[in-house]
């Protein structure tokens, strides 16, 4: 790898980073200017937060996170999204109204989020989980964590190594982390 190659981000990262930033800015402008119906905007924010993180997990973009430059770019975006979550978690515009038939003291009401912007914490929590699992993976095997979704064989084409059982377990755990962080308070 030449010096010029190390300064460039992979095209898949440029595309995902660009889309993530542009869509996030579009949502911010849309909210402030009232360009999108608030009900639809809250749904879009939920899918946006969940979708970006799932994209990182399911595609070769997960392998790119082993590069600290790329990881810290995503960490900065995750911190910005987390700040927006903190700023909006009590905002009535993003409130989820549940059926009156649901017991207010039930497990569901105690742990499931009551705002759509709670999904904005997903990227940060995912990245923390990724860093922990990738560190464990490197200590145990000497290899970085691979994405196992969409793989048609036990060989990873991008990295050119076999997918291990640990890759699969950590991918499943990261998927659970995404779901839980998107839906819980």
Protein language model regions, located:
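Membrane-interface segments at the starts/ends of alpha-helical transmembrane spans
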Residues: 5-10, 70, 99-120, 154-163
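Alpha-helical transmembrane segments
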Residues: 12-27, 37, 111-133, 169-178
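Transmembrane alpha-helical segments of multi-pass membrane proteins
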Residues: 47-48, 68-86, 160-166
